[in-house]
Amino acid sequence: AMELKKRGQLAEAIGEFRELIARNPGYIPTYLMAGNTLAESGDRAGALAVLHQGITAARAAGDAHALGELESAAAALEG
């Protein structure tokens, strides 16, 4: 997914990120990468939705570092 993003294939990268989240919802960094890619593609609402899913997952996992990053990314889009 990151390789697709680097090549500018954002729609394809987003599809891959969504698959990765579906297969491994406990891997928190994917939510941030997906949210950033959605925001880059112009889908602010989609980005916020994924970031908020990640915030929920990070809280459940007790991952304070990832939670902070996700909350910061969401706040930047909301602000």
Place the predicted regions along the sequence by residue:
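Structural marker of alpha-solenoid helical repeat scaffolds
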Residues: 23, 57-61
